[in-house]
């Protein structure tokens, strides 16, 4: 019996965030593709030559330092993950905490995580 699209979507909806990340990685590996968003074509002319200020950032946890429990709490607060998912994410450092966030949110999250004892990078 073949699964319908609705069956697959319902199964994915019941998965945890970490399970979905693992599923995406497995699909990328199996089919030889990436889940990256295609970049929009660049505008031509001298205006395009001007350096653009980056407006979206990825908040990456480089390490959790000495205060792992505090970092896990900060990650849970920022992402809404459950305790186990947040712990697994922190322990898998370097790991992306949030992707495609604006500069203000990225800076605020970086500050909170660093106050909790983590080493954080903005990319």
Curated annotation (Swiss-Prot):
PANTHER family: 39S RIBOSOMAL PROTEIN L12, LARGE RIBOSOMAL SUBUNIT PROTEIN BL12M. CDD domains: Ribosomal_L7_L12. The gene is rplL. Homodimer. Part of the ribosomal stalk of the 50S ribosomal subunit. Forms a multimeric L10(L12)X complex, where L10 forms an elongated spine to which 2 to 4 L12 dimers bind in a sequential fashion. Binds GTP-bound translation factors. This is Large ribosomal subunit protein bL12. SUPFAM superfamilies: ClpS-like (SSF54736), Ribosomal protein L7/12, oligomerisation (N-terminal) domain (SSF48300). The keyword Ribosomal protein applies. InterPro entries: Ribosomal_bL12, Ribosomal_bL12_C, Ribosomal_bL12_C/ClpS-like, Ribosomal_bL12_oligo, Ribosomal_bL12_oligo_N_sf. It comes from the Bacteria. One of its GO terms (cellular component) is cytosolic large ribosomal subunit. Forms part of the ribosomal stalk which helps the ribosome interact with GTP-bound translation factors. Is thus essential for accurate translation. Keywords: Ribonucleoprotein, Ribosomal protein.
